From Swiss-Prot:
<dbReference type="GO" id="GO:0098552">
    <property type="term" value="C:side of membrane"/>
</dbReference>
<keyword id="KW-0325">Glycoprotein</keyword>
<keyword id="KW-1133">Transmembrane helix</keyword>
<keyword id="KW-0090">Biological rhythms</keyword>
<dbReference type="GO" id="GO:0030431">
    <property type="term" value="P:sleep"/>
</dbReference>
<feature type="transmembrane region" description="Helical">
    <location>
        <begin position="137"/>
        <end position="157"/>
    </location>
</feature>
<feature type="lipid moiety-binding region" description="GPI-anchor amidated asparagine">
    <location>
        <position position="135"/>
    </location>
</feature>
<feature type="topological domain" description="Extracellular">
    <location>
        <begin position="23"/>
        <end position="136"/>
    </location>
</feature>
<keyword id="KW-0732">Signal</keyword>
<dbReference type="InterPro" id="IPR050975">
    <property type="entry name" value="Sleep_regulator"/>
</dbReference>
<dbReference type="InterPro" id="IPR031424">
    <property type="entry name" value="QVR-like"/>
</dbReference>
<keyword id="KW-0336">GPI-anchor</keyword>
<feature type="topological domain" description="Cytoplasmic">
    <location>
        <position position="158"/>
    </location>
</feature>
<dbReference type="GO" id="GO:0035002">
    <property type="term" value="P:liquid clearance, open tracheal system"/>
</dbReference>
<comment type="similarity">
    <text>Belongs to the quiver family.</text>
</comment>
<feature type="signal peptide">
    <location>
        <begin position="1"/>
        <end position="22"/>
    </location>
</feature>
<keyword id="KW-0449">Lipoprotein</keyword>
Amino acid sequence: MHYHTNLIAALLLAALIHEGSAIWCYRCTSATPGCAEKFNWRGIGFLGEHCPEPDDICVKVTERRGARETITRDCLSALSFRKDIPADKYEGCRPAAHDEKLANYVNHTIKEHDVRRDYYTDTTFCFCFLDHRCNGASGLQTSAVIGLLTLIPALLLR
């Protein structure tokens, strides 16, 4: 009898525990104080935000042209509009992908719109999802707590 009670409690707990909640990432640009190359989380004034997707990745995009440098820190899902994201998104840094057909059929004369994404001469994407200093899942969702609370009476009735 105890075996069945423990089995039911374990199955209930497994059903109620969801994936870890969304990853936390810093979301800022180098125009924000503290978000440049020398990062200072106290300067940006917050500890990051939840990414909207459950399997998201934190990204740091560094774009350079001459002495000018722009750094963007965000979730990968928020940058999904970009066409130069490298195919390999595993932990680490790599150069931006180059799309030969990007804006090939566009008759566009306003260079500030940068439809060809060629304003910056050097673009690097750094992906981060394993390093706890970069981000961290906030643990189990509240349904896991509810599952544990329902498991405790089952174990106490033994």
